[in-house]
Amino acid sequence: MSTPSSSLTTDESPASFILPDLVSHCPFPLRYHPKGDEVAKQTVHWLDSNCPDLTAKERKAMYGLQAGELTGYCYPYTTPERLRVVADFLNYLFHLDNISDGMMTRETAVLADVVMNALWFPEDYRPTKGQAAEELNPGKLARDFWSRCIPDCGPGTQARFKETFGSFFEAVNIQARARDEGVIPDLESYIDVRRDTSGCKPCWVLIEYALGIDLPDFVVEHPVIAALNQGTNDLVTWSNDIFSYNVEQSKGDTHNMIIILMEHHGHTLQSAVDYVGSLCQQTINTFCENKQQLPSWGPEIDDMVAKYVQGLEDWIVGSLHWSFQTRRYFGDEGQEIKQHRLVKLLTVAPPPPPPPPTPPPQSSDADTKKQKVKAQDGKGPVSDEEVWALVRAEQSKGSILESLFGFLTTSLSRIFFGYFFAYSH
């Protein structure tokens, strides 16, 4: 495949960039579930019918996402019933990603409590301290798909799903805190958090559910299995950073490896994309090498491991191809961009208007007199003695009652502000 000219992307303010050819580098065959399209229609209707507050724009994006089709690529050998449960989760996961974008730290913590409550108490809603008496919609959706997942889900798989989904929310909270503070993390910190904000880990657990297996803990915790899991996570996550960069930069979102490389490591846009692309290619190579290092645990476990590893491969190749099919990243031009790999940058959306200015507080009589003293002598901080000297001088201009009122007002103000600053610091 020919490579577009890089001259289009060498300006300080580029108008476009070139994608790495990750699809051609991936050695795994692409598969699709025979019932994938049918289940995709069912799952998007499930989310649509259970989210009455979505706007018309949000509904259009939901249908353009094609999360059900992603499920068909990544879980091609499961039963239609289990495919539907996994598809509902993937649609739900993207929904959580959308509603958590822009949330403050406190709001993401509330969201996490609501969802994890549904996973730990799937039979009925049990509000904990501080939770609303009526269950919020994200909790209802989680309880719906999870209650359908449990009957065919092994105990180890259930435990791992709840653990990894909990880690997802912890990482989302870290991301929200960085967003609150306007911080762009360093590369190492970003990679560590991104492995959880991606939501990939619970998706890997659902490979077990989809295939009807329940891997022993000692297998899941084996270094080679852990390396295969992390390699798949990195490949899916980092390639997603490349594919989603254009949309994210247009919204001012900084939770992206491309932006971090430009911010902290002096990369241009194109060199950052090329660098992440090379990391993805190296990760695919390392995955294949690690696969050859798998030990044997006996025929029964080896068969489960082989199915599980193939599930990881299906995720790698499926997510790469789906990224050009969904409208989430490239709109209606995905298939064309898949061929020529040239991405034209979207216009950056203007920032929201600033809030109206807060009117200045009314100055007290004592404050006004302090300003007068400062203006008269040009000195720094004004002492209490100087203020009261001016007060006494001006008291002769008014009645005794006015003088007494001025004294009481100033004294009470001094007491109030003294306590205020003492306790606020």
Curated annotation (Swiss-Prot):
Catalyzed reaction equations: (2E,6E)-farnesyl diphosphate = alpha-muurolene + diphosphate; (2E,6E)-farnesyl diphosphate = gamma-muurolene + diphosphate; (2E,6E)-farnesyl diphosphate = (+)-(R)-germacrene A + diphosphate
Known cofactor(s): Mg(2+)
Basic and acidic residues biased stretches: 366-377
Binding site for Mg(2+) 2: D97, D101
EC class name: lyase
Molecular function terms, GO-annotated: germacrene-A synthase activity; metal ion binding
Motif (DDXXD motif): 97-101
SUPFAM superfamilies xrefs: Terpenoid synthases
Keywords tagged on the record: Lyase, Magnesium, Metal-binding
Function comment: Sesquiterpene synthase that catalyzes the formation of alpha-muurolene, and at lower level (+)-(R)-germacrene A and gamma-muurolene.
PANTHER family: BETA-PINACENE SYNTHASE-RELATED, TERPENE SYNTHASE
Entry's family note: Belongs to the terpene synthase family.
Protein name: Alpha-muurolene synthase
Organism: Coprinopsis cinerea (strain Okayama-7 / 130 / ATCC MYA-4618 / FGSC 9003) (Inky cap fungus)
